[in-house]
């Protein structure tokens, strides 16, 4: 079954792996065996890859292995926050880096791994350089990048483009010029699951970067006063409203959810010409779209530049990686096991191959031959190229910001796309939660 972003990013109620053996398998020995503990996301196929890495490590370390526990849905965020705050966190903490990690790091709740990476420079050099940005807080590294990279991609329906007789956009001006062309044929220029909020956010992430460069959003992360009122930010906010006003999105987009994959269906059925979405969308199109992908109907590319913009067109946005941190409350022995797992158990050859077989691009460098031999070679190679060549890889804003600021962001993005607030009103609302 294809997974949506929220299936990938959402976690919740804990299910001990030992209790879930019949359903999804277990990797770890009991804690009485003297090992470390590890909480991570369940749901196949990702859970199977994670469990496989733990299994392999435990077979090599029968006396000091890792006990794993799996989770599902959004309640995990509350549970892990509570556990960390109470000093009862697992040894190894799975997460997304960014704003939440920043909170833990500044509170001294997770280990500083900077010196460990200095001592293991070969490991650091083996990973995509941009994957370390969401793992870094105040110049220090607090998490191990792991698993796969998920850039946001501009998808398009090749058949629809041929039908209308137009070419994929090479600039923002091209995007705006295509809007009336598709509307005249009764085809929505862009699909959008606007009810899900974060889908709208991807447009702003790219426009901020293409117009003003990564410095615009970085100023927000660094807590600069009134950073959202940067003139380039206002320009980006204005441009997205111009796209809405031009009927650039499917009618009724505010009532369409991404979790139902209704936005995906609009693209592969030809009711929409294009869609801005994460790399996980490819698997959904492949699974649900009949022969749409296999028949060569799906096109994909990086977001085009904005004429006169300051941003590097190689830059991308999305999820640079997933992340593993070590609880500062863990014992010395548990920390030792965790670091050994990072060095010898994470992103080893079998795990890398498993991610690729499941249609993902691992954050490990040097996988070109494996990607080229995969079932989805062209798409994975394009994604690897986008991720590895990106001058900057901006983390999804709702992960990069604190939970408080992220919720304010998502609420106001809905209003922005519904044209119920102006760019300056949006900026004012977000300025009020900078640093919170």
Region locations from a protein language model:
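Conserved N-terminal structural module of periplasmic/extracytoplasmic solute-binding proteins
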Residues: 2-102, 106-107, 118-122, 333, ...
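Extracytoplasmic/periplasmic substrate-recognition and gating elements
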Residues: 59-60, 246-248, 289-357
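Short helix-initiation/N-cap motifs at beta->coil->alpha
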Residues: 70-79, 172-177, 253-265
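Hinge/lid segment of periplasmic solute-binding proteins
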Residues: 98-152
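Short, solvent-exposed loop/beta-turn-alpha elements that line the ligand-binding surface or hinge
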Residues: 114-127, 194, 211-235, 289-293, ...
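Extracytoplasmic/periplasmic solute-binding protein
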Residues: 140-146, 152, 176-229
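Glycine-centered hinge/linker elements that transmit conformational signals in sensory
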Residues: 179, 222-254
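C-terminal capping/gating helix-and-loop segments adjacent to ligand/active sites or protein-protein/ligand interfaces
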Residues: 318, 358-368, 379-434
């Amino acid at each position: 079954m294809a997974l949506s972003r929220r299936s990938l990013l959402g976690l919740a109620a804990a299910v001990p792996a030992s209790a879930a053996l019949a359903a999804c398998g277990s990797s770890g020995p009991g804690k009485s065996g003297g090992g470390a503990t590890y909480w991570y996301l369940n749901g196949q196929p990702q859970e199977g890859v994670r469990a496989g890495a733990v299994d392999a490590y435990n077979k090599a370390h029968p006396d000091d292995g890792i006990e794993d526990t799996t989770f599902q849905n959004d309640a995990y965020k509350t549970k892990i926050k509570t556990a960390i705050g109470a000093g009862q966190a697992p040894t190894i903490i799975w997460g997304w880096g960014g704003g939440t990690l920043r909170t833990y790091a500044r509170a001294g709740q997770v280990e500083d791994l900077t010196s460990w990476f200095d001592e293991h420079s070969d490991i650091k050099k083996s990973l995509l350089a941009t994957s370390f940005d969401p793992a870094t807080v105040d110049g220090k590294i607090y998490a191990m990048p792991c698993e796969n990279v998920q850039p946001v991609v501009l998808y398009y329906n090749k058949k629809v483009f041929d039908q209308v007789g137009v070419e994929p956009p090479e600039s923002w001006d091209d995007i705006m010029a295509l809007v009336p062309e598709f509307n005249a044929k009764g085809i929505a220029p862009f699909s959008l699951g606007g009810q899900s909020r974060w889908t709208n956010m991807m447009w702003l992430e790219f426009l901020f970067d293409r117009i003003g460069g990564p410095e615009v959003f970085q100023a927000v992360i660094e807590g600069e006063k009134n950073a959202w009122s940067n003139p380039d930010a206002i320009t980006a906010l204005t441009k997205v409203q111009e796209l809405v006003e031009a009927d650039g999105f499917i009618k009724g987009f505010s009532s369409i959810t991404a979790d139902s994959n209704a936005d995906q269906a609009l693209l592969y059925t030809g009711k929409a010409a294009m869609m801005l979405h994460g790399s996980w969308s490819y698997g959904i199109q492949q699974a649900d779209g009949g022969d749409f992908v296999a028949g060569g109907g799906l096109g994909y590319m990086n977001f085009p530049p904005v004429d006169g913009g300051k941003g590097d067109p190689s830059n991308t946005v999305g999820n640079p990686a997933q992340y593993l941190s070590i609880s500062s409350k863990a014992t010395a022995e548990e920390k030792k096991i965790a670091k050994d797992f990072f060095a010898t158990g994470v992103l080893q050859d079998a795990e890398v191959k498993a991610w690729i077989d499941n249609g993902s691009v691992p954050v490990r460098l040097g996988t070109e031959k494996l990607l080229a031999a995969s079932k989805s070679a062209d798409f994975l190679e394009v994604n690897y190229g986008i991720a590895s060549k990106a001058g900057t890889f901006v983390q999804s804003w709702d992960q990069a910001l604190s939970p408080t600021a992220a919720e304010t962001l998502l609420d106001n993005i809905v209003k922005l796309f519904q044209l119920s607030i102006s760019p300056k009103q949006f900026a004012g609302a977000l300025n009020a939660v900078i640093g919170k």
